[in-house]
């Protein structure tokens, strides 16, 4: 006897079961789920897979998203503890890791999260050998290096969310000070995603007007408007949010989704993401730091060669030294 489905639908051809824009998110904590909902609402994936060790929470998050399927255009949402669920992903986003505690620097997290990466990355690569990997877990620059080493993938296909969020915060705060929307305020933060990040005051502009031409002291101690406090706010903002609500989630979820769009749509937009900087600006070690990168379907296809002034270059090198002093002690 025919089923209702058989009476209703006649199959004509077998469809290709391999997704064209499959995304896997490893880690379904606050950051992972913020990434998930932003990606779904932007219609960036035709399949979304969630992976976590907390099986009950994982199933609950999957069901909660599936029940909202009417309101977005991703046809398949799956989850599992086993990495086979991530097979054939175009992009794997790693958010798993120990959460940063109130007052804890991102660098203090490092060895705990290195050990977590060792349990994740080989399985990811086994099931998706052609994927790009976007690392979000903190400290993101060092963990991007660790993932690159563990994965065996080309450095161009492993990149960290890096200073994309720092730069977004920077532009928001500049806009607040000027009364202008952040999309019209242009400025970059490079280096470490964290305490030693480097604001490029020399490039800050609105409508092509460099603020440094209006006040050469902009961003320095001699600046009467104290613009340097904006960078201080950028550095301290995550700590403040963690103190207030326990974690950060929404802004990083939006920032990651911004990067995902550039990769899956092959937009070739320029983002400050964490990439290999050995050989740049006098850096001799295998360090990952944020510099402006062209992001597309192959990952990081190009870097933009910024002309740093002497102060900016010194700060960038200091940022590299800060990370190297931690990174060289890692065991993995």
Curated annotation (Swiss-Prot):
Its EC number is 1.1.1.27. Pathway: Fermentation; pyruvate fermentation to lactate; (S)-lactate from pyruvate: step 1/1. Keywords: Cytoplasm, NAD, Oxidoreductase, Phosphoprotein. It catalyses: (S)-lactate + NAD(+) = pyruvate + NADH + H(+). GO terms for cellular component: cytosol; motile cilium. The active site is at residue 193. It is found in: Cytoplasm. Substrate binds at residues 106, 138, 169, 248. NAD(+) binds at residues 29-57, 99, 138. The modification Phosphoserine is found at residue 301. It is an enzyme of class 1 (oxidoreductase). Belongs to the LDH/MDH superfamily. LDH family. This is L-lactate dehydrogenase C chain.
């Amino acid at each position: 006897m025919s089923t209702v489905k058989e009476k209703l639908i006649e199959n004509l051809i077998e469809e290709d079961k391999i997704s064209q824009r499959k995304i896997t998110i490893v880690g379904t904590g606050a950051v992972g789920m913020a990434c998930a909902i932003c990606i779904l609402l932007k219609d960036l994936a035709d399949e979304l897979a969630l992976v976590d060790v907390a099986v009950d929470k994982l199933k609950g998050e999957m069901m909660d998203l599936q029940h909202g399927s009417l309101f977005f255009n991703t046809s398949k949402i799956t989850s599992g503890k086993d990495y086979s669920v991530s097979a054939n992903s175009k992009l794997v986003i790693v958010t798993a890791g120990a959460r940063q505690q109130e007052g804890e620097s991102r660098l203090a997290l490092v060895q705990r999260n290195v050990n977590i990466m060792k349990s994740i990355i080989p399985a990811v690569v086994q099931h998706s050998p052609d994927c790009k990997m976007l690392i979000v877990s903190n400290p993101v620059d060092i963990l991007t290096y660790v993932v690159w080493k563990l994965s065996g993938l080309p450095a161009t296909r492993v990149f960290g969310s890096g200073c994309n969020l720092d730069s977004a915060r920077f532009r928001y705060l500049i806009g607040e000070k000027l009364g202008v929307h952040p999309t019209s305020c242009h400025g970059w933060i490079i280096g470490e995603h964290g305490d030693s990040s480097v604001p490029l005051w020399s490039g800050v502009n609105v409508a092509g007007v460099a603020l440094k031409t209006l006040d050469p002291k902009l961003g320095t101690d001699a600046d009467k408007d104290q613009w340097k406090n904006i960078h201080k706010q950028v550095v301290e903002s995550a700590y403040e949010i963690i103190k207030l609500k326990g974690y950060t989630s929404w802004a990083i979820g939006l920032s990651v989704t911004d990067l995902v769009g550039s990769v899956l749509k092959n937009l070739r937009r320029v983002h400050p993401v964490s990439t290999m900087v050995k050989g740049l600006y006098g850096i001799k070690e295998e360090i990952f730091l944020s510099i402006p990168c062209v992001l597309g379907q192959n990952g990081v296809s190009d870097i933009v060669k910024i002309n740093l002034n002497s102060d900016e270059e010194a700060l960038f090198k200091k940022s590299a030294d800060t990370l190297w002093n931690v990174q060289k002690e890692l065991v993995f």
